Each structure stands twice: as C-alpha cells, then as structure tokens.
Design a protein with these regions (language model features):
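Short glycine-rich, Thr/Ser-proximal phosphate-binding strand/loop in the N-terminal lobe
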Residues: 6-44, 48, 121, 126
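A short acidic Gly-Thr/Ser loop motif
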Residues: 13-17, 68-69, 106-110, 132
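Short beta-strand-loop/turn "lid" adjacent to the catalytic site in phosphate-handling enzymes
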Residues: 28, 35-38, 53-87, 114-123
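Short, well-ordered amphipathic alpha-helical segments that serve as non-catalytic structural scaffolds
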Residues: 42-56, 93
Length: 191
C-alpha cells in the first residue's frame, strides 16, 4: 500500500434482507452510510449503494471489508477480507461506544446478543426467526404500518395479549385471530 495515498475504509454488510455500506475516513469518522433492501438482488443493490457513495465523495481509494450472513461468498469472489458479523459489531462498539455493556443486534433472520462486561460473550438465536427483522416487518405489514409505526402504535397500548415468544410462525398465528376479534393496532404493536 502506498504510504502517501489517503485510504478510506469501506464496510459492506450483506444481510439476509438488506445491504448496508459505511465509508470511513482515516480518522474513522463516517462520511457516508446507507442501506437498502436487496430483494435477492445483492449485486445490483450493492452497486447502487456504491454509486451513491461515489456521487457524494468523488473518486477515492478504499480498503474494503465485508461482513454479514450473505457476505462470505461475495468476499471470496472479490478477494476482499471477510469479518464475521458479531466480531465486526463488537469491534465497532468497542471503538465507538466503549461504555456499552450489552448489545442486541436484530438481523433479518437472526438475533445476536453480545455481553461486554467481564470479557466478551456472544450468543445467537438458533431456533427460529421470531423476533428478528423479518418478523418485525411481517407484523408491521399485518398491521398496515412499518417498523417505526409499530413503535408509535405501541406507545398507546391498553392491553397485553399472550403471544408465542419463541417462534414467528406461532406468533403470527396468535396475532391473526386477535385482529379478527378486534384487538387494536396499539395493543398488538406492544406485543
């Protein structure tokens, strides 16, 4: 690597439902970040995000790194370093939010938790996508809103209903009859 060239770090996260990019300057300040759903068009979505970044920054020299559940294959095809997702999140939090005790990361189809106190301990759900981003999207769609709308509705809840907590399919099966019985969006969003 040329010592006189200014390099920027490009982080690429290829998830099960979205592509995320972050461009950092040499002082590790974020100068561009964005994400989009890829709808199974990962390469096109990534190309679009990179074009947006280039339009904002102009031509620059980058050092890319890839993470995410869908990133390993792309990493090997492009000969770009791959960092396991939980390692990338833990590393970023230690740099940007060193006071963090516990971090929860909801992916499209998985959920991860990282404990920092007393050493780093990482855990991941392994049973079902219940409680993940895809599940939240499904519930938002069922209630004819988006994820932010669920938060808005939940602020005004009046009742809590028993909903399956371990499986997204069972939770959806619990929610549909509640909708049919007239449960409010506010109450269902709180679940």
């Amino acid at each position: 690597m040329d010592q006189t060239t200014t390099y920027y770090t490009l982080g690429i996260d290829i998830g099960s439902t979205t592509v995320k990019v972050a461009l950092l300057d040499q002082d590790l300040h974020i100068i561009f970040s964005d994400y989009e759903r890829h709808y199974a068009n990962i390469q096109e979505t990534l190309a679009g995000l990179l074009k947006k970044a280039l339009n904002q920054t102009g031509p620059i020299d980058i050092i890319p790194v890839i993470t995410g559940s869908g990133g390993l294959t792309l990493s090997s095809h492009l000969h770009v370093p791959f960092v396991q997702e939980v390692v990338a999140v833990a590393s970023a939090l230690q740099d940007y939010a060193p006071q963090t005790d516990v971090a929860i990361e909801l992916g499209g189809e998985d959920a991860k938790i990282i404990y920092f106190t007393g050493g780093i301990d990482q855990r991941m759900n392994g049973i079902c996508a219940g409680g993940t981003g895809s599940f939240i999207d499904q519930m938002a769609s069922l209630l004819q809103t988006d994820a932010a709308g669920l938060n808005t509705y939940a602020k005004d809840y009046k009742a809590i209903y028993p909903i399956a907590a371990r499986c997204g399919v069972f939770a959806k099966s619990d929610i549909q009859p509640l909708i049919n019985d007239g449960a409010t969006r506010e109450d269902l969003a709180r679940q």
